[in-house]
């Protein structure tokens, strides 16, 4: 089973929070377990947690606004909104559980954005430990251009990038506005690539540059804005069936 939407919860941890890194590690340990309590619910298929990394990597572009992402793959947006209302078995009605009393001071810049999964591309077996996330807006003036861009990205560009060593799979995402959103929705499109390490993705882009290929093949580059590339370490991941087995 594959979900049709992602709910991405984005947050930073206050640098002034008591306990420093030890306290942040405790929050991460709790959040990893907490995510599984949602993923075990009907309509959820997968969950990941990621942490921004390699900020000074030469392949990074722009400034990513959040250190942590919690990603939930669901069949429909209403599934996630309903789960928020229900809470979890261990913390009904309190989304942050034992951290509820601290969340306003400890967890900063909290946002929640929903994305429609436009396509998935499975290139290789195996698992990468990092994600390269390409985020951007693009000015497409009519439905024909939208369709042309969609075809290019899905059937040409993404398979080409995934053909490089160390890149296993990828997802294309588009913001899906919903009343359950929190904060700025930011860029309309994301390309998420599961990779061995940040160099895997950066080397793919460098090879294209060395062969004289511009970003977005030069076809769409002048229409692109708010372009960002950020790298994230995958902290944890769990599928629906595994999450259920852990509970029982």
Predicted regions: what they are:
Residues 1-248:
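Macromolecular interaction modules
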């Amino acid at each position: 089973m594959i979900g049709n939407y992602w709910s991405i919860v984005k947050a930073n941890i206050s640098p002034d929070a008591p306990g420093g890194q030890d306290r942040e590690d405790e929050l991460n340990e709790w959040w990893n377990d907490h995510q599984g309590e949602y993923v075990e619910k009907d309509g959820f298929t997968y969950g990941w947690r990621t942490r921004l990394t390699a900020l000074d990597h030469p392949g990074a572009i722009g400034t990513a606004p959040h250190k942590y992402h919690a990603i939930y793959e669901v069949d429909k947006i209403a599934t996630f909104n309903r789960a928020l209302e229900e809470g979890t078995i261990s913390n009904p009605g309190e989304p942050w559980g034992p951290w509820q009393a601290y969340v306003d001071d400890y967890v900063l810049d909290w946002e929640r954005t929903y994305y429609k999964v436009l396509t998935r591309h499975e290139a290789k077996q195996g698992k990468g430990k990092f994600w390269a996330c390409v985020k951007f807006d693009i000015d497409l003036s009519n439905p024909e251009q939208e369709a042309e861009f969609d075809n290019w990205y899905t059937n040409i560009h993404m398979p080409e990038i995934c053909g490089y060593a160390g890149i296993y799979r990828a997802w294309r995402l588009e913001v899906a506005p919903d009343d359950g959103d929190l904060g700025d929705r930011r860029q309309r499109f994301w390309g998420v690539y599961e990779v061995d390490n940040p160099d895997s993705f950066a080397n793919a882009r460098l090879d294209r540059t060395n062969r004289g290929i511009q970003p977005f093949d030069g076809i769409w580059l002048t229409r692109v804005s708010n372009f960002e590339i950020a790298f994230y370490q995958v902290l944890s991941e769990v599928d629906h069936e595994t999450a259920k087995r852990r509970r029982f």
